[in-house]
Amino acid sequence: MEEKRMNEAESLELITSMINDSRARMTKNLGTPFLIWGYTTVAVSICQAVIVACVEEFYPYLWGWFAIPVVGWLLMLLFNKQEKTVTNYIDRCINALWCAIGVAAFILPFMGVFVFPSVIMLIGVGTATTAAVVKDKIVKRIGYAAIFSSLLFPFVRLLLSRLFTLEQFAGRERYLVECIIFAVIMFLLLVVSGRILNYKKRCLKS
């Protein structure tokens, strides 16, 4: 009976140690992926806004959004080569979560859904979940705030439909406004979160 209790205690201690080890390692390396995807997304969003403002036929340039996964994955490959670490079950679960979110975000444009708020909700869920694992309350709140901020898009569309006629605020102008809102939210969600995580990493080192 005592041996069984010891085995249970050892198992619990092993699980706790694994979680703490994952938390420490993830906190060490977590900020940079947020910055990579954040800056890439914001840069592409700004480019899209500029193209919409300057080009008459902007629809062919919508394929430019796929620069986000291409550039993001290339930069992540470079980052992972430099930061070779041993992973455990917790790490693999978080990686699987973000891979699933990435695949879902990639498929969304082909499904005819409202892409901007849907992507923000997905990234917000991933951010809040990851922050919960590493016990970062600020980043967790940012993730939840981003999820709720996705409601801005239908609200803005409703507001603009009341203030302007369809001719005054056609697809081009509405898309331009939504690109800007998307860029701002993604900057706050990913770039600010990445900066916070990197700042805490530097504090732990010192």
Regions found by a protein language model. Give the residues of each.
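N-terminal juxtamembrane cytosolic/stromal segments of multi-pass membrane proteins
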Residues: 1-30
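Selected alpha-helical membrane-embedding segments in polytopic membrane proteins
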Residues: 25-107
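Hydrophobic alpha-helical transmembrane segments of polytopic
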Residues: 30-41, 65-69, 116-119, 123, ...
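Membrane-embedded alpha-helical segments of small multi-pass membrane proteins
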Residues: 42-46, 50, 71-74, 110, ...
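Membrane-helix interface and helix-disruption motif detector
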Residues: 53-62, 108-118, 165-178
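Membrane-proximal helix-loop-helix units in multi-pass membrane proteins
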Residues: 88-151
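Terminal transmembrane helical module of multi-pass membrane proteins
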Residues: 126-206
